[in-house]
């Protein structure tokens, strides 16, 4: 089989039509799935010996949240090491990373698998994976044809990474660095709230402003602080963490500013505080609303003048520290109640960020669940950990008062429970493995009972016509995939569609 000029032109056009990289990547994957008639396709970015999904089609939504480390996925490692098209035989003993992750085919293993490494020059930047349920599904395509597809995908991904780096260099001071894959922190989520938060992080990271990060417990405020630091000019210097809620009043000042020998009972030597440790770097003060008013005053002085005094020392030390603070309280209300200094609040909240709770993040819960499933798989040495449809439905309708932290613990507990009731190293998480209280699932929609105005033949044809239409819509008008879904021969499906008036 040879790709026509029209097919290749259509792929190139789809890459130009998208608004933003994510949309272009999704258009590319959707188009390739139609052209190659595969059951699943994915575009992956390579970073730090792991593949990160950027766009998928035909795979469970939680795949977008998974991070595929090469050490745990020998097929992906083989793709990363190859310089060309990789075809895995149907009887390959290497496990497929997408086994159990094709909706409707959870119990079946992928049979046909092709991997296309993507390069920018000599640098591996990603991969394109094509999977099918039939062993010989991709035999009709030559390696040369697949190389053309890989070249188009590599160009799109390379341009996207280069644009991201150029945009980053425009915001950061200093000379431009040579091209390399853009580093990203593990901030998983595609919801509007998370997309906006990532944009704000990118903006404020390039500055040296203090940042106040607010959000409920368990939303990931520390992760936001880490993302800001890693994207800032201070990234080469330390990020120092201090939980203000865990500080006894008697040692809080010493923890922040240090002390000299003999300053108090037990001070047997000089000790640097967190501000000194973070010099030229970043200090993250978690739960800053827990600090006493006396310590708030001393912290304010550091922010104003940039100098500190160790406990028991009359000398001042100059420090250059960027402060990121986090709280789960409403500090405006704390100021009105007299429990937090207004001047410190204004110093800290030069650029406020708000982390949305998990219940407001829509499908992000499924992406995060996929991420934690993959973490559990690696930690416990399992071959696969997948979510059943019932488990996904449950997760999407639970309120998660404990936010992302509660989801993480729930996934870990469910994996342990499922593993205890199954033999082997494959784990499927069902709804009953989660102990969520008072989860109200929407009732299944009752099927409408039509008023019969047709004879049996007409009613049968109407049913067949609608069934085929729905199957085509679900498979992006891919007739081969539609036939597999309906469990019929593709030639018979074409003939039936013509008889029903669905094809010319």
From Swiss-Prot:
Q: Does the keyword Phosphoprotein apply?
A: yes
Record key words, sorted: ATP-binding, DNA-binding, Nucleotide-binding, Phosphoprotein, Transcription, Transcription regulation
Coiled-coil annotation reads: none
**What is an example of a GO molecular function annotated in this UniProt entry?**
DNA binding
One family from Pfam that matches here is: GAF
The GO annotation for biological process reads: phosphorelay signal transduction system
Biological source species:
Escherichia coli O1:K1 / APEC
Q: In this protein, which residues make up the domain named Sigma-54 factor interaction? A: 187-416
Q: Which CDD domains match?
A: AAA (cd00009)
What name goes with this protein? Anaerobic nitric oxide reductase transcription regulator NorR
Annotated positions binding ATP: 215-222, 278-287
Q: In which pathway does it act?
A: Nitrogen metabolism; nitric oxide reduction
Primary role: Required for the expression of anaerobic nitric oxide (NO) reductase, acts as a transcriptional activator for at least the norVW operon. Activation also requires sigma-54.
Database matches in PROSITE patterns:
SIGMA54_INTERACT_1, SIGMA54_INTERACT_2, SIGMA54_INTERACT_3, SIGMA54_INTERACT_4
Which residue ranges carry the DNA-binding annotation? 479-498
Q: Which residues carry this modification: 4-aspartylphosphate?
A: 57
Q: Listed disulfide bonds for this chain?
A: none
- Tree of life domain: Bacteria
């Amino acid at each position: 089989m040879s790709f026509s000029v029209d097919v290749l032109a259509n792929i190139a056009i789809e890459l130009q039509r998208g608004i933003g990289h994510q949309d272009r990547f999704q258009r590319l994957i959707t188009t390739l799935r139609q052209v190659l008639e595969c059951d699943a396709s994915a575009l992956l970015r390579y970073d730090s010996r792991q593949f990160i999904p950027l766009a998928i089609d035909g795979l469970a939504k939680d795949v977008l949240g998974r991070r595929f480390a090469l050490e745990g996925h020998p097929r992906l490692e083989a793709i990363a090491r190859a310089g060309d098209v990789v075809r895995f035989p149907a009887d390959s003993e290497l496990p497929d990373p997408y086994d159990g992750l094709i909706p409707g085919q959870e119990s079946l293993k992928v049979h046909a698998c092709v991997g296309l490494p993507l390069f920018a020059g000599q640098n591996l930047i990603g991969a394109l994976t094509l999977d099918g349920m039939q062993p010989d599904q991709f035999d009709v395509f030559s390696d040369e044809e697949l190389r053309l597809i890989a070249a188009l995908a590599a160009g799109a991904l390379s341009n996207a990474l280069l644009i991201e780096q150029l945009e980053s260099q425009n915001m950061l001071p200093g000379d431009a660095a040579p091209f390399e894959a853009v580093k990203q922190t593990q901030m998983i989520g595609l919801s509007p709230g998370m997309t906006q938060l990532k944009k704000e992080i990118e903006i404020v990271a390039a500055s040296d402003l203090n940042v106040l990060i607010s959000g409920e417990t368990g939303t990931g405020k520390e992760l936001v602080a880490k993302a800001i630091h890693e994207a800032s000019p201070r990234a080469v210097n330390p990020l120092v963490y201090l939980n203000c809620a865990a500080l006894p009043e008697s040692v809080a000042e010493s923890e922040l500013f240090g002390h000299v020998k003999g300053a108090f009972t037990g001070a047997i030597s000089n000790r640097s505080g967190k501000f000194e440790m973070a010099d030229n770097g970043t200090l993250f003060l978690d739960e800053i609303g827990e600090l006493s008013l006396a310590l708030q005053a001393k912290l304010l002085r550091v922010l104003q003048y940039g100098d500190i005094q160790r406990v028991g020392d009359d000398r001042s030390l100059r420090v250059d520290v960027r402060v990121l603070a986090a709280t789960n309280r409403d500090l405006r209300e704390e100021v009105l109640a007299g429990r937090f200094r207004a001047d410190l609040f204004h110093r800290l909240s030069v650029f406020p960020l708000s982390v949305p709770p998990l219940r407001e993040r829509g499908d992000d819960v499924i992406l995060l669940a996929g991420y934690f499933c993959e973490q559990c798989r690696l930690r416990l040495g399992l071959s696969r950990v997948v979510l059943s449809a019932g488990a996904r439905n449950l997760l999407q309708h639970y309120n998660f008062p404990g936010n992302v932290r509660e989801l993480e613990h729930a996934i870990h507990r469910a994996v342990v429970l499922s593993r205890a009731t199954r033999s082997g190293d494959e784990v499927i998480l069902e709804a009953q493995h989660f102990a969520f209280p008072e989860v109200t699932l929407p009732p299944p929609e009752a099927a409408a009972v039509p008023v019969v105005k047709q004879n049996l033949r007409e009613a049968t044809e109407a049913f067949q016509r609608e069934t085929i239409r729905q199957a085509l819509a679900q498979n992006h008008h891919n007739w081969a995939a539609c036939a597999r879904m309906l469990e019929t021969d593709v030639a018979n499906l074409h003939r039936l569609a013509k008889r029903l008036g669905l094809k010319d």
